[in-house]
């Protein structure tokens, strides 16, 4: 009888697309448009570690490269994303093995630090990850937009109200959004991820 062996390896860039089906299984809430964008743009220059068993990818961890501004210095860093294991292979320590392997590689490359946005903070606490910020999210309801539209139709409308444009961001807007954040907010923080058009 053949023994099933778990194998950890870093994929060649040409193999990155092999992880897409696992992404779609585990992160089923992601839209088709987002997954298309991610696998067309982000996987061009990222690093993907996988665990294979029976010659199939069973788990993955992706590292997306970013430049991070630490006060006045700019340093390379990786954002851990796409940590996923097929449902029937969970509970075998695959995530732990991938994380340790990736962090050891980063250490040998003298990567100053890495970051992530965990589904649950407790998952990564044993690996010395610590909470550094809380992401604020604001939802504007239909009443906000309706009131603004009624007000815009008024002859005495406020000029500042006219500056608000509500539409979905497009891929071509990414560069402008990154420049806006850099120009208006980067001086407010000691640590900030430098954004670009991608």
Where are each of the predicted segments found?
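Short, Lys/Arg-enriched N-terminal segments with co-localized hydrophobic residues
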Residues: 1-5
């Amino acid at each position: 009888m053949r023994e099933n062996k778990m194998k950890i390896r870093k994929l060649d860039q040409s193999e990155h697309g092999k992880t897409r089906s696992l992404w779609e299984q585990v992160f089923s809430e992601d839209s088709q448009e987002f997954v298309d964008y991610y696998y067309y743009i982000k996987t061009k220059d990222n690093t993907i570690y996988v665990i294979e068993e029976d010659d199939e990818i069973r788990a993955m961890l992706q590292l997306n490269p970013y430049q991070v501004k630490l006060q006045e210095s700019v340093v390379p860093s990786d954002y851990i994303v796409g940590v996923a294991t097929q449902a029937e292979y969970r509970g075998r320590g695959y995530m732990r093995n991938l994380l340790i392997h990736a962090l050891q590689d980063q250490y040998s490359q003298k990567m100053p630090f890495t970051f992530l946005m965990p589904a649950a903070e407790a998952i990564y606490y044993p690996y010395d990850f610590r909470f550094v910020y809380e992401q604020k999210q604001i939802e504007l309801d239909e009443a906000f937009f309706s009131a603004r539209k009624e007000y815009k139709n008024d002859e005495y409308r406020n000029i500042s109200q006219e500056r608000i444009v509500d539409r979905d961001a497009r891929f071509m807007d990414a560069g402008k959004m990154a420049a806006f954040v850099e120009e208006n907010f980067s001086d407010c923080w000691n640590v900030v991820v430098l954004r670009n058009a991608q």
